[in-house]
Design a protein with these regions (language model features):
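Structural signature of tandem alpha-helical TPR/SEL1-like repeats
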Residues: 70-82, 104-117, 140-152, 174-186, ...
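TPR-adjacent "capping" and linker segments in tetratricopeptide-repeat scaffold/adaptor proteins
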Residues: 44-60
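Helix-start (N-cap) detector for alpha-helical repeat units in TPR-like alpha-solenoids
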Residues: 51, 58, 92-93, 126-128, ...
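Terminal, low-structured helical/coil segments at or just beyond the last alpha-helical repeat
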Residues: 38-49, 207, 212-256
Length: 256
C-alpha cells in the first residue's frame, strides 16, 4: 500500500492508517490469549457425534501442536497441526489452532481459511473461530461482516468477554458508538482483567469527545497492562490525537 494512497488527501490517509494500526494493535493480544485460554470455551462446547468420531484420530499430533502453540512456539506448532488435519480431516479444533498459529505468524489469508473451515465443520456451533474470524475482518476493516459473524459467536458463548470485546471493535469501526460502548462494558463485566477493553473504551470515548472518560479509561489501562512500555505508548498516542483534534476544532471555529 502506498502512503498516502493515490487520490486521497494526506489527512484522510493518515486517519485511515491510524485506525488500521489501532485495530492491529488491540487485536493481536486478545487473539493469542484466546488460543491460550480457549480450553474453558472448548469444555463448554457440547460433545457431539463428530467429537466421538475424532477420538484417537490425529490426537497425538494435535496435542503436540497445541502444546507448542501454548508455549509460544508458533512456527513449530504448524507442522503438527497440519499432520493432525491430514490424519483427521474433520478435526475442527486442529483447524482452529492452525488458524491461531497462522494469525500469529501474520498469514491472515491462511488464518481466515482455517477459521472458516472450523466454523464449517461444526455448522457454526463452535464460537472461538467465529470470534477469531471476526477479529480478522475488523483488522481488514470489513466491520459489517465482522459484526455479523461476532453476533453469531456471542449467541453461542454469551458469557465470552473476548466475543464482546471484538463485537465492540466492529461496532466502533461502524461508528455505532453507543453500541460499541455497551459491548466493551459488557466485556469487562465478563472479565474485569481484560485491559485491552479499557483501551478500546478510550478510543470509543475519544470518538465521542468525552475527555474525562478517556482519562479514566487510560488511567485504569496503564495500571492493568503488564506491557507497560506499549501501554504508555498507546496512551500517549491517544492523548496526542485528542490534543490535535481539539486544536483543529478550535482553528476551524475561529477561521472566518
Amino acid at each position: 500500500m502506498t502512503f498516502p494512497p493515490e487520490g486521497t488527501s494526506m489527512r484522510y490517509s493518515f486517519r485511515t492508517l491510524r485506525s488500521k494500526l489501532f485495530f492491529a494493535a488491540v487485536l493481536v493480544s486478545p487473539i493469542t490469549s484466546l488460543a491460550q485460554s480457549d480450553s474453558k470455551l472448548r469444555s463448554n462446547y457440547v460433545v457431539s457425534v463428530q467429537d466421538l468420531k475424532l477420538a484417537g484420530k490425529g490426537h497425538a499430533a494435535f496435542d503436540k501442536g497445541s502444546r507448542l502453540l501454548e508455549k509460544g512456539d508458533t512456527a513449530g506448532s504448524v507442522a503438527y497441526l497440519e499432520r493432525a488435519i491430514s490424519e483427521s480431516p474433520e478435526h475442527y479444533k486442529a483447524y482452529y489452532d492452525l488458524g491461531v498459529a497462522y494469525f500469529r505468524l501474520g498469514h491472515l489469508a491462511e488464518a481466515e481459511q482455517a477459521f472458516q473451515k472450523a466454523i464449517d465443520l461444526t455448522g457454526g456451533g463452535f464460537a472461538p473461530p467465529q470470534f477469531a474470524l471476526g477479529a480478522i475482518f475488523c483488522q481488514k476493516q470489513e466491520f459489517l461482516l465482522a459484526e455479523t459473524i461476532l453476533q453469531r459467536g456471542v449467541e453461542i458463548e454469551s458469557g465470552s468477554a473476548i466475543g464482546k470485546y471484538y463485537l465492540a471493535s466492529a461496532q466502533l469501526g461502524l461508528n455505532r458508538l453507543v453500541e460499541a460502548e455497551r459491548s466493551a462494558e459488557q466485556a469487562l463485566v465478563r472479565n474485569a482483567n481484560l485491559a485491552e477493553a479499557y483501551l478500546l473504551l478510550a478510543r470509543i470515548h475519544q470518538r465521542q469527545r468525552n475527555a474525562p472518560a478517556v482519562a479514566r479509561d487510560l488511567e485504569v489501562y496503564l495500571k492493568m497492562d503488564t506491557h507497560k512500555e506499549f501501554a504508555r505508548r498507546m496512551a500517549d498516542k491517544i492523548q496526542q490525537e485528542m490534543a490535535q483534534d481539539t486544536a483543529a476544532a478550535v482553528i476551524a471555529a475561529i477561521r472566518p
